[in-house]
């Protein structure tokens, strides 16, 4: 299926690109989330009329993500969790826990922004974590997991 991208989509294309994707990906994800429209003649003309506005919105989103990245870069967040004698946690620290701790510090971070490539944190220590704030902007923070008494 041919679609017009209404936003930058990672590993697919930029705003305004006409790309061919599988029908299910378009029908079940791209179109319902507003990231794409079918590439019909009417939609192509409507997109051409809206292109300047959509580019301005995309630039605003990018500027906001860069501003948030500057505030978050190098930040450290401490999370306490019950742990055993060997340093392994009873439970784990997930991306939702990290996002919640950052929100408590006053940062605007959603749990989908937190990237844990090795899965949840399951031991005490310091961990580097990447926050993907935009498809072009990321911030590196440090998560310190300490044991509760």
Swiss-Prot record:
- GO CC terms: ribonucleoprotein complex; ribosome
List all membrane-crossing ranges: none
Name a GO molecular-function annotation: rRNA binding
**Top-level division of the source organism's lineage:** Bacteria
Q: Which GO terms describe its biological process?
A: translation
Keyword annotations for this protein? Answer: Ribonucleoprotein, Ribosomal protein, RNA-binding, rRNA-binding
Family membership:
Belongs to the bacterial ribosomal protein bL9 family.
Sum up the protein's function in the record's words: Binds to the 23S rRNA.
PANTHER family according to UniProt: 50S RIBOSOMAL PROTEIN L9 (PTHR21368)
Q: What is this protein called?
A: Large ribosomal subunit protein bL9
Source organism of this protein record: Thiobacillus denitrificans (strain ATCC 25259 / T1)
Q: What gene name is listed for this protein?
A: rplI
